[in-house]
């Protein structure tokens, strides 16, 4: 796969989000579904790509059409944004298997809708 892939920059990328970073994002108005803890949240990004001006975080999930790992992928995006100092608006997240591919913007997943906005506006 990687031999002819000009978009993938890394596989199995370890990421972590410190408790202070979780608190920072929560103070900034992000909705994050994670319990308060004194330990870092850790994980591994399966595939990291640069495509069309976005950093793509891809996670392989068997039976991708039966799972919804939004919280996990949002945490990975927040962790990578914290490490790289890139704004969250430059990230896209996706999960996939051999038959399906689902993609979303993590920024839309963490910001509550403002009064008068609809999901289509964001």
Where are these regions (language model features)?
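Catalytic cores of nuclease domains that cleave nucleic-acid phosphodiester backbones
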Residues: 1-52, 87, 102-107, 114
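Intrinsically disordered, low-complexity terminal regions enriched in charged/polar residues
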Residues: 109-122
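Compositionally biased, intrinsically disordered low-complexity regions
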Residues: 31, 96-100, 118
